[in-house]
């Protein structure tokens, strides 16, 4: 009988720079799910890749004096090197510059045009080149791009548009009445912010740059990002191309995993495209948060980007895989810090798991020469307190994996590992070993521990595929015993199993020394980044002002007491702040970078004497200070150590 299929995808990553820990999380999470499904017996297809077209790529290539293809080739090689190092078991790697993908996109575009869902029009508005986006006057924030805060220019461009409105009702039902979107809490947000106000037709072509897929029937146009990028999930299966022929086998996808910044495109635009093509919809869209550094969004421009290769070289790929998966709950942001990472590695991997394996193997060697005798003596109640949770573990883990809650799956495994360590303390094998008449009981205790190690490391092998085979070698578990079926059985190891002492699975890290060294690395990164951002001695086009003019600006610390999105403006947040003299309302274009609930209680610097202005129908009485740190990244200046009302001089 044919195996049941399972198709899982990462987003295709934009190779405008080297991969970082955020890319790593999504890919490691998908890899762990793919490995778990393979262990369950599924026919798995795991897809990842890179999204290689667009104006930004064209511009970056020009800056380096190379062709766009040569530019992306270099960065794609770095992505693949990282995935190899992190032991990512992808089955296919798609590039949007692949000929077969280009063929599929061109045919999809023509099919949507022929069906009347794509039409030709003109896009007018304020254009932001770095964001490759048009904006209406009302969407601008202080006259600038609401995405990145940069200056915009008046522009009009002939373009093709995709009709979204015909699919609004079906998409609303998809989000609210099915379990397509995980976590489900995101569904209401999408419906209220995007569907209820009315879905606007989507611009799907450009004439202002050439690095893209040409529209076959109108070669002056190239296909714009989302029709190109989203189609990868089906072009990689051979849809409308001859590269592969398993579209009917694997589609629809079982899981698309993406970060929250591209949730809208996968939750609204992608289903609409599939509906227009009369294709089945994916089963699940799993949306995760961002990994921040010490609570601050990572940015290459300020030098706080965490390089997974650097960490992996210090602690091993499996330790990094475990840490990022254990720390992030689906849908929530996770703050990365050197202290948390090292403490997690020491506590869970070195102490709990590593010590369990090393102590058990060492005692088997010490008291039985490495081979357990077949005699047994049970303590039914005490043994059951270890064996029963171990037997229930596999199905608990499977439930969490079905829900894409990898952190909870790992937590369940480590509960059983913790129970095994406690079992050692309760059974006192070092005392049993001194009494010849208790050797049968000692053999039972050690065998129970070895079986728990087998079960837990079998399940952990999906998350840490390099280290767990080392544990199996130490406990005498041959490869044929490491199966999904055996993970719910007790008594699989031979009664007279032979153990083999080996190196520590995860050596303990000197916390203070490592933190000092890592902090020094980050500091050096930040100093280098800051130096690179320093302005030249003379900045053409920027007028100098007198000190008297500058002194008219009143900068004051204010505490954010409430914050909410503005439904009519996707980029704006409405903040209530206490400036020391009372409450005032400020509207700020920071929604792409901050969630409202994360800002409440934060202290910020505001321009307190700015003339009030109305933005999208809301009065804004001031402006908060934020920095444009590059890479389409804006960061608010937080001053949590100062009381509200403090004057900034």
Give the role of each language-model region.
Residues 115-168, 172:
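Cys/His-rich short segments
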């Amino acid at each position: 009988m044919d195996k049941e299929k399972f198709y899982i995808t990462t987003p295709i990553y934009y190779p405008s720079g080297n991969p970082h820990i955020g890319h790593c999380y999504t890919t490691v999470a998908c890899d762990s799910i793919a490995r778990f499904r393979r262990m369950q017996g599924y026919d798995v297809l795991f897809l990842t890749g890179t999204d290689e077209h667009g104006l930004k790529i064209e511009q970056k290539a020009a800056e380096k004096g190379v062709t766009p293809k040569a530019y992306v080739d270099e960065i794609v090689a770095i992505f693949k090197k990282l995935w190899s190092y992190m032991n990512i078991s992808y089955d296919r790697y798609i590039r949007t510059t692949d000929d077969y993908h280009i063929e599929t996109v061109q045919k999809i575009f023509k099919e949507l045009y022929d069906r009347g869902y794509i039409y030709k029009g003109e896009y007018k508005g304020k254009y932001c080149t770095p964001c490759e986006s048009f904006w209406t006057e009302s969407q601008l924030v202080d006259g600038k791009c609401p995405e990145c805060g940069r200056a915009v220019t008046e522009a009009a461009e002939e373009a093709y548009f995709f009709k979204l409105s015909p699919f609004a009702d079906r998409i609303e039902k998809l989000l609210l009445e099915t379990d397509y979107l995980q976590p489900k809490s995101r569904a209401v947000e999408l419906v209220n912010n995007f569907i209820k106000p009315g879905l606007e037709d989507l611009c799907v072509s450009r004439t202002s740059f050439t690095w893209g897929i040409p529209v076959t029937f109108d070669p002056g146009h190239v296909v714009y990002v989302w029709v190109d990028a989203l189609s990868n999930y089906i072009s990689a299966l051979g849809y409308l191309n001859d590269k592969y022929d398993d579209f009917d086998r694997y589609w629809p996808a079982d899981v698309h995993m993406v970060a929250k910044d591209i949730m809208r495109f996968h939750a609204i635009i992608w289903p609409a495209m599939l509906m227009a093509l009369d294709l089945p919809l994916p089963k699940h869209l799993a949306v995760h948060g961002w990994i921040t550094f010490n609570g601050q969004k990572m940015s290459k421009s300020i030098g706080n980007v965490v390089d997974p290769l650097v960490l992996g070289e210090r602690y091993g790929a499996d330790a990094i895989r475990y840490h990022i998966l254990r720390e992030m709950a689906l849908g929530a942001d996770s703050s990365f810090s050197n202290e948390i990472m090292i403490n997690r590695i020491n506590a869970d991997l070195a102490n709990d798991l590593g010590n369990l394996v090393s102590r058990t193997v060492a005692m088997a060697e010490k008291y039985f020469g490495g081979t357990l005798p077949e005699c047994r003596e049970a303590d039914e109640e005490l043994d059951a307190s270890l064996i029963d949770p171990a037997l229930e573990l596999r199905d608990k883990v499977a439930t969490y994996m079905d829900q894409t809650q990898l952190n909870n799956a790992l937590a369940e495994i480590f509960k059983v590992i913790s129970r095994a360590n406690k079992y050692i303390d309760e059974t006192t094998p070092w005392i049993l070993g001194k009494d010849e008449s208790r050797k049968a009981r000692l053999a039972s205790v050690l065998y129970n521990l070895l079986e728990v190690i087998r079960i837990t490391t079998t399940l952990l092998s999906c998350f840490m595929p390099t280290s767990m085979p080392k544990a199996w070698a130490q406990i005498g578990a041959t490869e044929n015993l490491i199966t999904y079926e055996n993970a719910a059985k007790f008594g699989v190891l031979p009664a007279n199993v032979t153990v083999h002492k080996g190196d520590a699975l995860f050596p303990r890290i000197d916390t203070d020394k490592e933190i000092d060294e890592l902090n020094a690395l980050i500091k050096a990164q930040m100093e280098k980044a800051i130096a690179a951002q320093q302005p030249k001695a003379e900045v053409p086009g920027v007028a100098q002002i007198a000190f008297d003019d500058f002194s008219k600006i009143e900068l004051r610390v204010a505490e954010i007491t409430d914050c909410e999105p503005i439904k009519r403006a996707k980029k704006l947040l409405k903040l209530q702040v206490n400036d020391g003299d009372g409450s005032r309302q400020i509207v700020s274009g920071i929604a792409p970078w901050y969630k409202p609930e994360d800002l409440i209680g934060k202290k910020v610097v505001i321009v307190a004497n700015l003339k009030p202005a109305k933005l999208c129908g809301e009065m804004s009485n001031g402006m908060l200070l934020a920095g444009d740190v590059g890479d389409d990244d804006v960061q608010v200046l937080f001053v949590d150590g100062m009381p509200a009302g403090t004057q900034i001089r």
